[in-house]
Regions:
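Hydrophobic alpha-helical segments and helix pairs
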Residues: 87-131
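Core segments of cupin and vicinal oxygen chelate
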Residues: 2-3, 8-10, 14-56, 95, ...
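N-terminal beta-strand motif that seeds the catalytic metal site of vicinal oxygen chelate
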Residues: 1-24, 76-79, 127-158, 170, ...
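Structured core of small recognition/catalytic domains
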Residues: 155, 161-264
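Short, positively charged
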Residues: 91-100, 220-225, 266
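Vicinal oxygen chelate
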Residues: 12-21, 49-52, 67-92, 112-117, ...
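Conserved short beta-strand elements that form part of the metal-binding/catalytic scaffold
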Residues: 36-72, 118-119, 123-130, 168-203, ...
């Protein structure tokens, strides 16, 4: 099992969480689909549930919430990028055309976080680890394996993430329009335009990919549990993948990748 025990390097996707309209139903869905274990957490943390796989943190699930009198945020997955200093990240985000949606805040002794949007509108989080580094297992069936930025303007996004958060875009030979996102010499994610298989008008967003043993059987399981198939299973260079939507509307991808192609960490 690819276990992570050291803090993630700044800019690296380190955690994901889901804002759900029905937290318990979401916990049940992902337990049945991926084998996650989790329960609604303490009230002092808003009931936030840290789900585990093999006893290690894999993702968070929380109930929809927002400022009083404001519309609730959409049901969606949020990718968090690691940072050594959330307050410095806030300044860098604002200074490079991003928008800080929630100012840096402490999460007990676990860490310090903020939520922001890049200049193309994609929402993401920033996590400054203290006692909690983020995902403790990756690249294992049921765990996070890839994070992809689908954006209406790859140029604007690329110009933002490198100076703001240390994510450097690079072209990939033979994959026109698709870019790797790199921290130092390590690829930690990807970036592309909004895929045609998504609904017209879909805003820019980060999409998580989960590793699976069998893409087709997982897609069948999603459908049986009242989810929706957005992009049916298909083969690509890095494996067999599909894009689906859970019963509450959160979109994510699953991929069955050859073991030799799995990275050590996301």
């Amino acid at each position: 099992m690819p276990v992570v025990t050291d803090p993630y390097k700044p800019g690296t996707p380190c955690w994901i969480d889901l804002m759900a309209s029905d937290q318990q139903a979401a916990l049940d869905f992902y337990r049945d689909l991926f084998g996650w274990q989790g329960e609604i957490g303490p009230a002092e943390f808003g009931g936030y549930a840290v789900c585990t796989l093999g006893g290690r943190p894999v993702a968070g699930i929380m109930a929809q919430s927002g400022p009083e009198g404001q519309p609730l945020p959409p049901v969606a997955w949020t990718t968090y990028l690691a940072s050594d200093d959330a307050d410095a990240a806030k300044a860098a985000i604002a200074g490079n055309g991003g928008t800080v949606l929630y100012d840096p805040m402490d999460v007990g002794a676990l860490g310090r976080m903020l939520v922001a949007a890049d200049p193309t509108g994609a929402v993401f989080g920033v996590w400054q680890a203290m006692d909690f580094i983020g995902a403790g297992v990756v690249n294992e069936p049921g765990a996070l394996v890839w994070n992809e930025l689908n954006t209406a303007d790859t140029g604007a996004a690329g110009r933002f993430y490198q100076p703001a958060l240390g994510l450097r875009p690079a072209t990939i030979q033979g994959m026109d329009g698709y870019y790797s996102l790199n921290v130092g010499d390590r690829t930690v994610g990807g970036m592309q335009g909004i895929p045609k298989y998504l609904d017209p008008g879909t805003p820019s967003h980060w999409m998580p990919y989960f590793s699976v043993d069998d893409t087709d059987s997982v897609v069948d399981a999603v459908v049986k549990r009242n989810g929706t198939v957005i992009q049916p299973p298909f083969d690509m260079q890095s494996g067999r993948m599909a894009v689906v939507k859970d019963p509450q509307g959160a979109v994510f991808a699953v991929i069955q990748a050859p073991e030799a192609q799995l990275p050590d960490s996301p």
